Amino acid sequence: MSIGNIVQCIGAVVDIEFPRDAMPKVYDALVLEEGNDKSFAEKGLTFEVQQQLGDGVVRTIALGSSDGLRRGMSVMSTGAPISVPVGHGTLGRIMDVLGRPIDEAGPIEADEKRAIHQKAPKFDELSPSVDLLETGIKVIDLVCPFAKGGKVGLFGGAGVGKTVNMMELINNIAKQHSGLSVFAGVGERTREGNDFYHEMKDSNVLDKVAMVFGQMNEPPGNRLRVALTGLTMAERFRDEGRDILFFVDNIYRYTLAGTEVSALLGRMPSAVGYQPTLAEEMGKLQERITSTKTGSITSIQAVYVPADDLTDPSPATTFLHLDSTVVLSRDIAALGIYPAVDPLDSTSRQLDPQVVGTEHYEVARRVQQTLQRYKELRDIIAILGMDELSPEDKLAVSRARKIQRFLSQPFHVAEVFTGSPGKYVPLKETIRGFKMLVDGECDHLPEQAFYMVGSIDEAFEKAKKLQ
């Protein structure tokens, strides 16, 4: 337990000098000593060692506000990395990056503490899965189905519905799924964390969820490490042989926190100002989110896309690690079609006839072909109008517009705003509905009948009312 002194403080990055023979190791946790009186610095502020500069000086990130720090303050080395409580004591609780409770419900009684930096499971321990995870959301189940124990990314710019989609997935999967969930709020709005907590509480599944938050207002050190804290809790449940759901909102803020810290640590920036270690940091996190022979982690991650540019280094690096990508499009949101999932841009490794079956695969591909044809004809329609199209093309456009509307769906979590009850559509119903559409069995129905309904039977009922 060596003691050092602060020698320099620049924002969240603090240099601390220790005796040369007692320098802390990289990733060790250091704690601000209590005896630093007359300072309004955070009590028990934790630092994480990032670099050893030599001569006994280490460069650290403060995991908390660095306000009130000054040179000469004494800091104690703990001799170990940051460790957080794991296990059943964390369920139903809200914690910060260090695993401290922030829900004012007393201390967390955990049977074990684990370091947040762990190695990814070995290759021979991994267990690939091909079982489908039904979400009840038509467009996702049809075009980009999820795998149990797979990794899913929800990509979208600002305000196209990533968080609402994630809340609906939590509503449909976490409530039906009898297992445990871990939610990591990384650099998002505190209001959304609050909404999530109340959503879980009202539906009586709070005792199956562990929540870890490092929100927008927190220093970059917290936002950088909070994803690892949540993941460490999920890994413990997985190692017990359970099937875990791990939600992260938002992976982009994890990258952004890394960028802020990287600049303060004096590293040379790479493309678009990102940290040079972007791929490594993302890989370290994503390779740990995996299913082993003992248990599985199914992870659903929201990914903010800066300026709607999917080629930006941050979303582009995230793409590499995922099994399914759900791309939300501003153009579709502008048409009033929610969820605003782009069925032509979204992909899934599960969409394979050997996994989902021939019928599902063929229906999904025919739906995509019809929508693609409509996309190609849109310019001609804009210039010359519908009358100039051949009868086959007119039919394709008519079907595509119906398919486009049938891909919309009322959400349970949006009932409060829309006033229409949410719909959960089983996979068989989804396939049956879209098969009828592409086979031309619904050509006589008006396209309004397909907007914001659940199954195809509801569309027929709505059509009767419209006549």
From Swiss-Prot:
Coiled coil: none
CDD domains: ATP-synt_F1_beta_C (cd18110), ATP-synt_F1_beta_N (cd18115), F1-ATPase_beta_CD (cd01133)
Topology with respect to the bilayer: Peripheral membrane protein
Entry's Gene Ontology molecular function annotations: ATP binding; ATP hydrolysis activity; proton-transporting ATP synthase activity, rotational mechanism
Binding residues for ATP: G156, G157, A158, G159, V160, G161, K162, T163
CC per GO annotation: plasma membrane; proton-transporting ATP synthase complex
Main location: membrane
Reaction catalysis annotation: ATP + H2O + 4 H(+)(in) = ADP + phosphate + 5 H(+)(out)
UniProt xrefs under InterPro entries: AAA+_ATPase, ATP-synt_VA_C, ATP_synth_F1_bsu, ATPase_a/bsu_AS, ATPase_alpha/beta_chains, ATPase_F1/V1/A1_a/bsu_N, ATPase_F1/V1/A1_a/bsu_N_sf, ATPase_F1/V1/A1_a/bsu_nucl-bd
Superkingdom of the organism of origin: Bacteria
Location of the protein in the cell: Cell inner membrane
EC number(s) reported in the record: 7.1.2.2
Keyword vocabulary terms for this entry: ATP synthesis, ATP-binding, Cell inner membrane, Cell membrane, CF(1), Hydrogen ion transport, Ion transport, Membrane, Nucleotide-binding, Translocase, Transport
NCBIfam families: atpD (TIGR01039)
Task of the protein: Produces ATP from ADP in the presence of a proton gradient across the membrane. The catalytic sites are hosted primarily by the beta subunits.
Subunit structure: F-type ATPases have 2 components, CF(1) - the catalytic core - and CF(0) - the membrane proton channel. CF(1) has five subunits: alpha(3), beta(3), gamma(1), delta(1), epsilon(1). CF(0) has three main subunits: a(1), b(2) and c(9-12). The alpha and beta chains form an alternating ring which encloses part of the gamma chain. CF(1) is attached to CF(0) by a central stalk formed by the gamma and epsilon chains, while a peripheral stalk is formed by the delta and b chains.
PANTHER family noted in UniProt: ATP SYNTHASE (PTHR15184), ATP SYNTHASE SUBUNIT BETA, MITOCHONDRIAL (PTHR15184:SF71)
Similarity section: Belongs to the ATPase alpha/beta chains family.
Protein name: ATP synthase subunit beta
Source taxonomy: Bacteria, Pseudomonadati, Pseudomonadota, Betaproteobacteria, Burkholderiales
Protein's gene: atpD
